[in-house]
Every structure is written in C-alpha cells, then in structure tokens.
C-alpha cells in the first residue's frame, strides 16, 4: 500500500506497534492507517497560522476590507435602554454622522461589515416575582427603500399568528423591501423558584450591508436621511402582560466607500 512521504511507520518485533507521524494536511490524501480524532476537523485549524492551514482555508478567506470600500475600519456605538413590549419596538442602528473622525462617515456611502450586540435583558422587582417565562425576540432587518420620518412599526412589517412575536414573518407585500438578516432571542424566567431575572446578550454577526444616506446632510444621522439599506433592530417579547427591559450596547464596524 502506498504511503505519503510525511508518514513514518515504526514497527518493532516485540510490541508490534504501528505509528504514524502526520506532517501533512488530512485533506490532501487518504491515510494509510486510520487516524482517531477527538476534536472537530474544522476547529483543529483555528489557532494555526495561515501558511500551515489547508489550501481550502487560504483560497476562500474573506477579505478584511469589503469590495468597493477603503480603510480604516471605523466604529460607531449606540447605548440604549428600551422597554420591550409585546407589540414590539424598533431602533435604527445604521445612523452614522458625517465627519472626519474614526466614528464618522466621509461621504454618503459606507458598508457595515459587522455588528456586535452586547448587553442584557432583565425584569423589574414586581415582574420577576410572578411565575412566567418571557422570551425577547430580536430581528435585524434591512430596509432596502427607507421612506418617511420613522421606521415602520413591528406590526406593520411582520405578519403574526394570534399576535405572537415568535411566529413573526415579513408580510408578503413587503418582502422585496424588508429582509431579515439575523434573528436571535433571549429568555428570562420569573417566580420564587428557578428564577432567571436577567439574560446576557452577546452576539456578533457579519452582514456586509451597503448603506446610502443623503450627501447634503452634514451632521444629522437619522432614519429619514437614509436612501438605501437602513439597518433596523426590531424587538418584541412573547409575554402579553409582562414587559422586560433591555440595556444594550450596539456597535457597528463599517468602511467608507471608494465611490464617495
């Protein structure tokens, strides 16, 4: 049986032990002696340098700077505390002020490469004493054609069965305008036993969304100034009578477009 040049077989007449020293990638060719791997193959290459990874990881690595953009990577943070109800609320997370700083956009076009949600969902003293389970649904939505002074409400965008946010889907006549890019949830539990009065939210998503705002707006960064691809965060809780609070820090990482 043919063996690779990186394989060394050690055989002694007493112990009859066959060992392989594998210096090559497990994806290059089939092994002569089976390998017992205790970890996932995909995770085994995570902490290795790029030149020691298989060819598939070197060829299809995503670029650091999105196509059509230029560095440096800029950061915009939003700190907010919201009262999340069963009917839902909405926040615009692509408001970036125009300027020359590391947190400003240069022109009217920029690309949001990734977004980071950090914070917690919690209940007040009166609500956490009641026996109930409440889940907060988060929808990161892209509005391709923003219109009006404020975003559309949760009930105007999503179609729900029996007004339940866990069954929310974008309405059929709005599917070409609103796109759900990411969806996640957090759970809190109230009651004397098994209480979970707060839940941490820590999510990082790569989205690569190109946002366009009006060019003549010098400082204001609002939803009404968007012309293309506004990023909206819709939030709603599943319990009808017990609202929850969300203390969030939302951070977007974006690049300026070269067509500004």
From Swiss-Prot:
Name under which the protein is recorded: Capsid protein
Keyword terms, alphabetized: Capsid protein, DNA-binding, Host nucleus, Metal-binding, T=1 icosahedral capsid protein, Viral penetration into host nucleus, Virion, Virus entry into host cell, Zinc, Zinc-finger
Organism: Tomato yellow leaf curl virus (strain Israel) (TYLCV)
Pfam families: Gemini_coat
Superkingdom of origin organism: Viruses
Xref: Gene3D superfamilies: 2.60.120.20
Keyword Zinc tagged: yes
Subcellular location as annotated: Virion; Host nucleus
Record motif Nuclear export signal, residues: 102-123
Residue positions of motif Nuclear localization signal: 41-55
């Amino acid at each position: 049986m043919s063996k690779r040049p990186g394989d060394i077989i050690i055989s002694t007449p007493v112990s009859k032990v066959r060992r392989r020293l594998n210096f090559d990638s497990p994806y290059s060719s089939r092994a002569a002696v089976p390998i017992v791997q205790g970890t996932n193959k995909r995770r085994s290459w995570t902490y290795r340098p790029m030149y020691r990874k298989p060819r598939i990881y070197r060829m299809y690595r995503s670029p650091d700077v999105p196509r059509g953009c230029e560095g440096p990577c800029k950061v915009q943070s939003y700190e907010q505390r919201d009262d999340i109800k069963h009917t839902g609320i909405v926040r615009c997370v692509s408001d970036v002020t125009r300027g020359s700083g590391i947190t400003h956009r240069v022109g009217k076009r920029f690309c949001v490469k990734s977004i980071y949600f950090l914070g917690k969902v919690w209940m007040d003293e009166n609500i956490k004493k009641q026996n109930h389970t409440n889940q907060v649904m988060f929808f990161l939505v892209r509005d391709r054609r923003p219109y009006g002074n404020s975003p559309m409400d949760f009930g105007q965008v999503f179609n729900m069965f029996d007004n339940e946010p866990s069954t929310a889907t974008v309405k059929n006549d709005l599917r070409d305008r609103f796109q759900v890019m990411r969806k996640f949830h957090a759970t809190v539990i109230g009651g004397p036993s098994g209480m979970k009065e707060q839940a941490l939210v820590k999510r990082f998503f790569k989205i690569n969304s190109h946002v366009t705002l009006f060019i003549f707006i010098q400082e204001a960064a609002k939803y009404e100034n968007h012309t293309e691809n506004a990023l909206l965060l819709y939030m709603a809780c599943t319990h009808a009578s017990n609202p929850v609070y969300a203390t969030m820090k939302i951070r977007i990482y974006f690049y300026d477009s070269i067509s500004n």
